[in-house]
Amino acid sequence: PGALDDVEAGTGQYTTFSLGSNSSDSAVGKDGKGNLNANSNPGKITAVTDSSASGSAWATGTKTYNNAVDVDVYGNPQLNLFELAKAAGKATGNVTTAEIQDATPAVLESHSSERGCYGPQGKTDGSSNDAAKRCLVNQLKENGGIGSISEQLLDTRADVTIGGGSKYFRQTVQGGEYAGKTVWEQAKEMGYQTVENDPAAMNALEYKEGQPVLALMSDGNM
């Protein structure tokens, strides 16, 4: 009993409920005011989640590891909100002031084992060797994978997509039908109404049946 006298009141509860006896898979967390919450989403590997893991939980209902986008801890893609909505015949739209490939908007339209897989060459200029900013080999189109977040965004085909991150659409597709073309060129050939960093062109857009809007208004975040 004496050993517990020096422990701050509440520490036992915090350890038990928030950390789950040192497990990072607890469904209960502690907010900034010290209150226990039953709706937190600690990541699988670490007790502190990031936006990709928490966003994936929100978009798919599946908890996963930090840096993952809509895949489970084994890397298996999980159905997300847009896929469910489109299957039900609903219109979909994704509008953000961030780069459209950023984890929070990306969880609506893509699946990736690495959140930095923004374009075919990753979140880089194509020359970086930083593994955290590149796509995993088995995800690349040239290796039979589902492609980068930008490429998957086109396949998901939301009715309206507006945000930043246009520079990643200038990367070159490496495999499949559109190999050798930029992601922007692929979008146009797939029937998208495209706007790149052009407010006037954005304002001139009109609804056209079967021609989704893809307007990326900044190279990075808006």
Q: Language-model features: where?
A:
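N-terminal catalytic scaffold of extracellular/periplasmic and nuclease hydrolases
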Residues: P1-Y207, Q211, S218-G220
